[in-house]
Amino acid sequence: MSDPTTAREAIALVADDFTEFSFTEGPLAGDGPLGWPGYSAAHARASARTGETESVVCGTGEIGGVRAVLISFEFGFLGGSLGERTGARAAAAHARARARRLPVVVLTATGGSRMHEGMRALLQLQLLAGESARTRAAGLPQIAVLRDPTTGGGWATLGAGSDVVLALPGAQVGFAGSRVRPPDADPAAYTAEAQLAHGHIDAIVTPDALRGTLGRWLSLLTRPAEGPASPPRALGDPDTPPAASGREAVARARHPERPRAAAYLDAHFSVRAEISGDRAGGVDPGMRCGFGRLPDGRTVAYAAQCGTSTRPAGFRTAARLVRLADRLGIPVLTLIDTPGAANDPEAERAGAGPAIADLFAAVATARVPVTSLLIGEGGSGGALALAAPDNLWATPDSYFSVIAPEAAASILKRPPEESAATADQLRLRPGDLLDLGVVRGIVEN
């Protein structure tokens, strides 16, 4: 069942002080570009029923103290379908957002392209995708809220093309609408919950929490910190002396009670909002990515490994985070803590190598400053991909190595009891890393 909320009710749910855009439009020409029998009458009935003249309502409103352009779909108007006028209005809204340097919030509820207008309607997808790309290139954030339903071209342009994608619980979300799917298709695959599980949306938000969630996101994405992020202070025991050996450094980094990414994020940021998924079918709970507010009210983006072997989806999500922060001019903080990249057959099938390469490239080409802190295990390339060149720091409870000591001993055909000596030879302690010029410094507790 479709969301009964109208376009204007959806706007009122999330925004204050809404000012609608006016559009200069002539009367609908007959039965449209195809001369579709009865189209003009259907259009008139939809207008009379909803009080709207098209399937979108556009304007500006205030959300959490941030002015934004809103594009809200009216599903009661011909199923919220995308016609030429729909495209023209949404395109104009994007153009006005760029002219005024405002973020864009889209409240979708659409079945897709309007068949009464044929290819002229389908071409609106190119128009909207282009406008979204230009807004993205202008460094302005775009947030989509997927209402029920969000299918077809609306999902594939304004929905999935947004920087942050939120959805209402139970919303029907998918490229294929309910009437064009295979007859044996599992309907659960076309839901917001399924899209979240497969990395295509960032969060499911209840209607009562939507205003606050949007306000938090807009506040974070529009107030970047100035200059590089400072590395957080270490959270371990300040009275613990430096590791006396490589083996001890590894043991401390692997200790189950050592502070992990969650503790660092909680201590460093007063407010956070997280993205989820790599937009390619994967989610890695061991890589937390998002945006956090510093005590001065400014925003830093973060990508944090949580001590597990990082999956390909985790590397791709981190790359997505770095590129989004770069477009918005927000400095990045990365927290490194992994025994290494996942190396099981499924990880290889999911593209471990290409995913790591993608993250290396995102960090290397970022125009915003990137700061990295090694908080635990630094396991080879799976850790290095998240490290900022020339701006890497370490905590006393960490190590960084070309390979785990046990694996190195195995490759060198040494007996297991020689792994401790191998750890010393690898010079992986924080102090060793400082001497080698790998890290800039060791942060204190």
Name the predicted role of every residue range.
Residues 7-10, 42, 86-89, 93, ...:
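General structural feature for long, well-ordered alpha-helical segments within catalytic domains
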Residues 69, 75, 83-86, 121-127, ...:
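Glycine-rich phosphate- or other oxyanion-binding loops that anchor nucleotides, phosphorylated ligands
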Residues 136, 305-332, 350, 360-368, ...:
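A structural preference for long, well-packed, hydrophobic secondary-structure segments
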Residues 110-227, 339-445:
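Conserved catalytic cores of soluble enzyme domains
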Residues 1-63, 67, 211-300, 304-307:
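Intrinsically disordered, low-complexity segments enriched in small/flexible residues
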Residues 50-54, 80-92, 274-286, 310-323:
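Glycine-rich anion/phosphate-binding loops
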Residues 69-71, 144, 251, 291, ...:
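Structured core elements
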Residues 61, 65-74, 89-114, 292-306, ...:
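A structural preference for short, pocket-lining loop segments at secondary-structure junctions
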